[in-house]
């Protein structure tokens, strides 16, 4: 959830650190800070609020000289947002400064131990115990002090450390939190995400859990907990630098909504060879797939809702039970999972803490794992037996859009691939569905082209305090994501319900002019959903229906209708979700919300 950066080289470090922190804003934060090494002294600047405040305080870094430094964006976990609780934190003797992403689970015991030994704490954070431990263990060898400190920590951490006695060095450590080293010429970097590095280098080293590194302008040395050297491969970063910029759009979210046709196509096209689907280097043989008696999809947030939508598609195509589980619940549920379970894990960042923990639990029980992630080299990608990447490019807005639709794209490919392997559908049906899948980017674009109409509808609904989203089957899964989009960026209370459950309590909340967004795409369930619309209309609700072009029945029961292109119902989520994304965007804009960085939210949830 936090973001960390570090630099050592010949340039002034402050502007590079500030720029790197800006690139990490999408992860979510409430405060920020930098620490610079200069002439044997450590200088610190910390602020509550936006990085713009930090730039102002430091005069864009000019008032904080030095060619080695570290930076941090904080999302509060221990201690309220404040300048004092912001990172970097400094040792009592002023010799060390650190930045930390993660949570130290045993920090209270360490805090009590260090307090008893005379160490003074300035903040309420778990992180401060780390810098005092380093000071305690330091006997002239910072490398040994960091290793000894790490051995005392329980939980997750990506650490960046500077020492006044080592003026041109950075020290880093990783455990269950992402950390990437940027390899330059006469300068080197570290960051919690490649987006902070690509403006300066395309060469990266991905640290693994339990690894440490000593970084100077000339070289990077990676070692393990025994101090032994670890040989690491340099990976080329392929993301386009400009892809992380707004490109003329007012917000990243709008830009990313508009990019969905391209992202969807970029995700499916390389995996379709003539009439065959090629799932990268996965070895999902017919023999193995026949042994699978259950597919479990696990994720958090929007990724989970993508799994819920695709569940119906995969189950119908493959004739195999598909269960969707929230990762934060699955990991604690003593799941009935074994070697006959195929686990599909979804995460845009590939670093979602609860998802990683659930994945490890299921792997320990024998499940084979497929990871659907957007970040190459991420923790989840490396943990999985097979990684299938969503080629969405960097997604900066906290509220996911193209990340969600490209996850659907991979899940659709998986469903078709598996159904064909298991001979659960005919070749004729397979070819027809594959053609429908290949047509989806165009259909998504047609939906985006209705943005002017959706903006007009948003004007009608933006000043409400509460909204409901309803649907059946896949439409209900889409309602879940639609409600999430509305609440997370517009701060309007929005809840989703299975349409058939309204009469079991929820209908008591319907009152005059309460907006109800009804997803009505599934023809087989149309009459049932329309009857639910009539029920809420009778109680005064204003109904906005989302349905396929040509469905004229809906006009008689809805106040407003958004028509999206007609596609196979198995793939309808990819087009139905787009107007809901745009509706949430325009409602948030009309309410003057911080669309790209909603309050209290983080893009990449790397703590539990």
Enumerate the predicted regions with their spans:
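Conserved phosphate/anionic-ligand binding catalytic regions in large, soluble enzymes, centered on
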Residues: 24-33, 101-105, 172-181, 250-253, ...
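Glycine-rich phosphate-binding loops that contact phosphosugars or nucleotide phosphates
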Residues: 290-432, 436-439, 519-562, 583, ...
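Structural beta-sheet core signal
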Residues: 4, 98, 161, 172, ...
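Generic C-terminus detector
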Residues: 542, 557, 567-608
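Active-site phosphate/pyrophosphate-binding segments
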Residues: 260-264, 268-296, 386-515, 588-608
């Amino acid at each position: 959830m936090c973001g960390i950066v570090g630099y050592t080289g010949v340039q002034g470090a402050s502007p590079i650190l500030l720029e790197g922190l800006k690139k990490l804003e999408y992860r979510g934060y409430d405060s920020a800070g930098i620490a610079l090494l200069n002439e044997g002294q450590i200088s610190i600047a910390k602020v509550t609020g936006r990085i713009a405040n930090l730039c102002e305080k430091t005069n864009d870094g000019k008032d904080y000289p030095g060619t080695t430094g570290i930076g941090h964006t904080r999302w509060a976990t221990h201690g309220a947002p404040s300048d004092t609780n912001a990172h970097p934190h400094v040792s009592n003797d002023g010799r060390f400064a650190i930045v930390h992403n993660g949570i130290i689970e045993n920090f209270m015991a360490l805090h009590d131990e260090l307090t008893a030994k005379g160490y003074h704490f300035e903040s309420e954070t778990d992180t401060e115990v780390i810098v005092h431990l380093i000071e305690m263990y330091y006997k002239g060898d910072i490398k040994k002090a960091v290793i000894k400190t790490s051995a005392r920590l329980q939980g997750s951490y990506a650490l960046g450390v500077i020492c006044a006695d080592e003026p041109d060095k950075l020290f880093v450590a990783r455990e269950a939190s992402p950390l990437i080293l940027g390899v330059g010429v006469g300068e080197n970097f570290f960051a919690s995400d490649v987006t902070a590095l690509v403006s300066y280098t395309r060469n990266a080293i991905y640290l693994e859990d339990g690894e440490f590194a000593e970084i100077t302008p000339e070289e990077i040395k990676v070692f393990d907990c025994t101090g032994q050297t670890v040989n690491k491969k340099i990976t080329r970063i392929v993301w386009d630098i400009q892809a992380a910029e707004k490109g003329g759009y007012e917000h990243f979210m709008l830009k990313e909504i508009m990019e969905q046709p391209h992202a969807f196509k970029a995700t499916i096209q390389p995996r379709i060879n003539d009439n065959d689907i090629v799932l990268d280097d996965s070895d999902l043989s017919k023999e193995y797939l026949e042994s699978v008696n259950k597919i479990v999809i696990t994720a958090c947030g929007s990724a989970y809702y993508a799994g819920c939508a695709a569940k119906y598609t995969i189950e119908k195509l493959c004739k195999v039970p598909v269960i969707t589980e929230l990762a934060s619940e699955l990991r604690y549920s003593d799941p009935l999972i074994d070697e006959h379970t195929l686990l599909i894990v979804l995460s845009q960042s590939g670093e979602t803490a609860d998802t990683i923990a659930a994945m490890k639990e299921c792997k320990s029980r024998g499940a084979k794992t497929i990871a659907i992630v957007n970040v190459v080299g991420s923790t989840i990608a490396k943990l999985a037996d097979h990684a299938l990447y969503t080629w969405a490019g960097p997604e900066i807005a906290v509220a996911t859009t193209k990340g969600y639709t490209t996850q659907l794209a991979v899940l659709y490919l998986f469903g078709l691939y598996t159904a064909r392997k298991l001979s659960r559908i005919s070749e004729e049906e397979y070819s027809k569905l594959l053609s429908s899948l290949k047509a989806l980017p165009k259909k998504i674009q047609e939906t985006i082209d209705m943005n002017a109409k959706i903006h007009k509808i948003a004007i009608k609904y933006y000043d409400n305090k509460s909204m409901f989203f309803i649907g059946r089957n896949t439409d209900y899964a889409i309602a879940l994501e639609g409600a999430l989009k509305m609440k997370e960026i517009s701060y309007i209370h929005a809840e989703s319900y299975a349409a058939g459950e309204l009469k079991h309590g929820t209908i008591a909340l319907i009152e005059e002019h309460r907006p109800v967004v009804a997803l009505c795409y599934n023809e087989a369930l149309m009459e049932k959903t329309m009857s639910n619309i009539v029920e809420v209309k009778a109680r005064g609700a204003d109904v906005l229906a989302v349905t396929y072009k040509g469905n004229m029945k809906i006009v008689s029961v809805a106040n407003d209708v958004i028509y999206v292109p007609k596609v196979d119902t198995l793939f309808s989520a990819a087009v139905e979700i787009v107007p809901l994304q745009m509706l949430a965007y325009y409602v948030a804009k009309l309410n003057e919300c911080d669309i790209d960085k909603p309050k209290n939210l983080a893009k990449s949830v790397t703590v539990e």
